[in-house]
C-alpha cells in the first residue's frame, strides 16, 4: 500500500514504529520526516501529488497535494499555507501533478540544493486514462496470452500456493 510505504520513506521507520500500518491509521506526526532533516541541511523541499498521510506535509517548503486518494478527473488540491483547504482544478490528474512539479522546478531557488517528491495517482486503482487516450486502441484486438487462464496446477509449490490470484485479489472481472 502506498500510504504505509510513504510513511516508511518519510520517517525511515518500519510501519509498526511509525504508526501507519494500514490506510485507516495515521502516521505518528511526532516522528521526524526526512524532509525536515533536508531543510535543516539547507535544502529546499517540495512534494506534489498524492500525500494521503493524515497530517500536514511537514518539512516541505512547497506542497501541492491531492485530497485523500484523489480523483483522476478534475481533482482537488491543497497547497502550501492552506493545508486542508482543497480547491478543484480542471484536467487529468497526471497532467496536473506533472505541471505543478515542473512549475516548482522553474521557480525554485536555483542557488540551493533541492528535493522534489512527485507522487502520481496513476499507479492506484481504479485506473483511468486521460480522456485524450480513452479510444486510442478502440479498434485494436489484443489477444490474450496462452497463460492468461493458467491455474498454476503444474507449477512449483511457491507459484501453486500463491495467495495473490488475478481473479480474487486483483479484481480481474472489474478491470476487464
Please annotate each region the language model reported.
Residues 1-176:
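Formylglycine-dependent sulfatase
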